[in-house]
């Protein structure tokens, strides 16, 4: 079932369309879950270059001989690589139209990731509210889970962002009041 409010294209002239991915504030529905595809297979280059770029020189991530002698018996993908790729997979839908990222919370690394693993992500909308200080924008919180090709959860985190509204209310307090059933001003 397609929701007509989740438009990925805008018609710029008759018969001509432009990609316009990403949710606006009105599109976020608490409880909805978005599966992010395609998956992303982690390569040795991803792991080593990203580890060194971030100055993470732990040999478990960049020295195959060292890693072979550990409990993992192979290079372990840096948690920053895992986080970056899983978070990046969410951008097209969750934050392509965002005004700003406000923060990440409750980051949990649930299982190791290795070169050759393919990661998939899904995001559940947890909360949303109009911004009281920034008319035309709202604050949205989401929970993202990353899984490997076997369905094993490898990472999860909460993320809060500032989202633009398609049709901003003239007074954000009025919108909050309406959402609260007329009780916000009392």
What residue ranges belong to the model's regions?
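Hot-dog-fold acyl-thioester-processing enzymes
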Residues: 2-104, 155, 166-186
